[in-house]
Amino acid sequence: MKKKLYIVGVTAALACALVGCGKKDTTADAGVYVKDDVIEFVNVELPTAKADHDSAIAAYNAYFADGSNQDLSTYKDTLQNTAIPTMEKCITTISGIETATDEVKALKDTYLQSVQKEYEAMKMVVSAIDGENADYLTQADSLISEAASLMNDYQTQLQTIANEQGIVVNQ
């Protein structure tokens, strides 16, 4: 009986020792995981949405370009038929991106908030043209400023993560 208890005790101690030896260093794995997730997000997932975003912003800014001869009606049509639908597509694309880490989710959320502010500003400009209400233009300008601030936050967050993970970011 004592022999059986001794064997059970030694076996249990050996099992506990072996389980402890197999423990992974999760901090090193987490770093690799964040690095891979950032690279996937920035290089694979985001470029399609960024292309739509850039296209919509170019349409929005065309009215303000030097030498532009668009009238307000044409500008409104461009916003309604090109820029706003393209921004909606961009928002849908970004919203559909799945991230694996909290760090990249925060990046995605900041980028998405910036794009949503620009989208709201475009809709506000259309409303201003329809109603000729100067307050709408002031609100749109405020939204654009908020969007720019959020995009700066995104760039800062991205650079911080890149520095921590040893990633080179080409701007």
Map each language-model feature to its residues.
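Bacterial signal peptide processing site
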Residues: 22-24
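Positively charged n-region of N-terminal signal peptides that target proteins for export
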Residues: 1-5
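Sec-dependent N-terminal signal peptides
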Residues: 6-13
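Alpha-helical segments in soluble extracytoplasmic regions
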Residues: 34-114, 122, 127-130, 134-170
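C-terminal motif of bacterial Sec signal peptides marking the signal peptidase cleavage site
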Residues: 17-20
